[in-house]
Amino acid sequence: MTNTGETKVIESHGTIKKIDSLSTMPYCGVETDENAVVEEKITLESGKSWSPKHYELLHERIERLIDEKQQFFSLEFFPPRFVNGVPNFLERVERLSEGGSVFVDMTWHMGSDPANVDKVTSSSSIAASMLDYCGVDTMLHMTCVQYNKADTLKHLEQAKAMGLRSILALRGDLPPGTELEDTHQFRALDMIRWIREEYGNYFSIGCAGYPLGHPQAPSYKADLMYLKAKCDAGANFVITQLFFEAETFEKFVRDCREIGITQPIIPGIMPIMGYESIKRIAKLSQLEIPQHILDDLEPIKHDDDAVQKYGTERCIEMCRRLLDNGTAPSIHLYTMNREGSIREILKSLGLWKLEGDRVFPWKNRSQHPIRCLESVRPIYWSFRPRSYITRTRDWDQFPNGRWGNSSSPAFGDVSSYYLSNLTTVRNADDRLAMFGANIESFEDVKRVFINYITQAPNADGVKVTVLPWTEAETGVQPETSLISEQLVWCNENGILTVNSQPSVNGAPSTDPLVGWGKPGGYCYQKAYLECFMTAELSDKLIQIIEREFPVRVNYHAINKDSTFDKTNSEETTPIAVTWGVFPGSEIAQPTVVDPLSFRAWRDEAYQMWMAQWGDFYPKESKSYGVIKAVHDEFRLVTLVDNDFQKPSVLFDVLQKALDELKK
C-alpha cells in the first residue's frame, strides 16, 4: 500500500465471489412479491397530507387546530452545554418531535451566550439547528432586560436570517445581584411593540402568563392587566409559567377571559422529575409547592425512580383534567431535555401521534418556513440529510417539482465542525468497536461493509449500524432487503457500496418498503448503485457499458481530486431516479442523479474515509495506511439502470467487468 509499502489494494480482485443470480426483478409491491421481507415496525399507512404547502405561521396553525378541536402538544428545551452533546440533543429533539409536536422552543440561556450565532451551543444556534435538522417549527425565547432596543432588534434580525419566525417575548430574569434600575428596564411589552413596529406580522409572537401572578408584580390583578397589554400590543398566544394545581390554571383562564384576553392560553407543564430539582426550580420561579405534594414526596424523596413515577402520574392526571374540561387547548411540556417520561406522558394522554407516512423518500421539512416547498433532492445525500441541509442552508429557495437544468448548484462547504461533531455516532471508540480496532488488510474493510448490510455482529459481537457515509444509527433501509444478496456480493468482490436502490415498477404508495406520498398512488424507481472501486475495475466497467449498454446504463466515475472524471450523462441534465404518480396531482420526482451535484458530493464522500474512519487510527499504523490507500486509489462510481421495467443489469455489468479484468 501507499503508506506501508505493502501490496496495493487492487489485488483484492484475485478471487471472484459467485452467487446464484445477480439479476433483480423490478419490485411491484409487497402484495405481489412473495420474497419481500417486511419488518413488524413497518406499517402500511401512508400520508393523508403529503404535498408541500406554503408555510403556516405558528399562531395560525395553533388557531386552526383549536378551531378543528384537535388537541396538540409542544415541547421546551434548553441548549446543551458542550459541543459534543449537540448531536445527541438534536436526535432527542427529533425523536420527540416525531410524535407530532406542533412546535418546539429553545430557552434564551444566558450561560450559552444566547445571541452569538458563531457559537455552536448558543440558544440562537441551537434553535436554528432544531429548525433545520429536526424539521419542526421552532420558537426562540428572547429576553430584553439585559439589552437596549438596538441589541434586541439585532437579535430579531439574526433570528429572521436563520429562518426562525416564532418568538417568545420575555423580559428575562435579572442577573444575580442586579436591581431593575441597574438594567435598561425594557420589558416584554416593549419587545412586542418593537417587533410589530419593525416587522409587522412576519413573526408569530408568544408571551408569558403567570397563573399566580408575576412575583414582582404589584398584584395578581395588575399582572393580568399587564398580560392584556401584551396581547393588545400584538402577542398571538400565551404560554404560562409552571404551576402545580389544575385549579390554578382554570381560574387564571377564567380571569383572563373576563378582562377581554381572547388569545389562546397554553398551560406550561413541568413534570416532577426529581425531589431536589423541583424544589430548586420552584425557588428560582418564586413559587410555593403545595404542602400535600411535599407530603407525598417526603417518604420517597431519596428514591429517584419513585419520585419520577409520582411526578409522571400526577402530571398525566392534571393534564387530562385540563384537556377533558376544555380549559387547555394543548399542553406545553418543559422537558428539561429529558425524553422517557415526556414520551410516557404524551402517550398516556393520547397526544403522541407517530407519523407513519413518508411525504417523500426523504424527510420533508414541512414546518420549515423556507424548505416547506422543497420537493427534489440529489440522491447522493440520502443517508446524510443533515449534511445536505448544512450545505444548502444559504439557499433562499429550493427546487419544487423538478430539479431543472442546473448550471452550477451552489453547495456550501462542509465545515470541519460538521465533519467532526454533527455526526450521529457518539465517539471514536464506538466507531472503532464497529469497524475494528485494527485493520490489517483490505479484507477487513470489506467485512465492515458486509456486516453493515447483513447486520450480523462483527468478530467482537458488535453490530455495524452506521458507515462513514450514513448519519443515523439505524442500519440499512427496509428496501435494501430486496437487493441485499447482490450488495453483499459486491462488497465480497471489493466493490464497496455506499448507496443503492432497487428498481420499482408501480408499487402502491402505501407499500411498506418503498411507498411514499398520497394514498392511491404508484411509486417508481430506477435501479441505482453508488460504490468505491479500483481504477482498473472502473476502466473495465466503462468499456463494457459503452460497448454493450450505452443507452440503458448511465455512469459517472471520479477520483479523489477529479483528475479522473468521466460520465456518459448530459452535464447539466439531471436524471430522475425516483418518481410517483398520484390522484389529482402532477408527477412527482423527488430524487435525481445530477453530474454537477455529484462533484460536490465527491469532496464529502472522500473526506468521510478519513474524517470518520482513518483518522481514528495513529497515522503511522497499518490501519491508517489501509484506509488511506482506499481513499487515495479507489474511484467513486455511480450507476443508473434506465430500464425499470426489466430485470436490472447493474450487477451483471459488474460481473462482466470482474470477469474481463480477471482474464
Swiss-Prot record:
- Names of the cofactor(s): FAD
Q: What class of enzyme is it?
A: oxidoreductase
Q: Enumerate the residues binding substrate.
A: 173, 241, 334, 338
EC no. given is 1.5.1.53
Q: Which reaction does it catalyse?
A: (6S)-5-methyl-5,6,7,8-tetrahydrofolate + NADP(+) = (6R)-5,10-methylene-5,6,7,8-tetrahydrofolate + NADPH + H(+)
Q: Does the keyword Phosphoprotein apply?
A: yes
For biological process, the GO terms are:
methionine biosynthetic process; tetrahydrofolate interconversion
GO MF, one term, reads: methylenetetrahydrofolate reductase (NAD(P)H) activity
Top-rank taxon:
Eukaryota
NCBIfam families per record: fadh2_euk
Family that this chain belongs to: Belongs to the methylenetetrahydrofolate reductase family.
The protein here is known as: Probable methylenetetrahydrofolate reductase (NADPH)
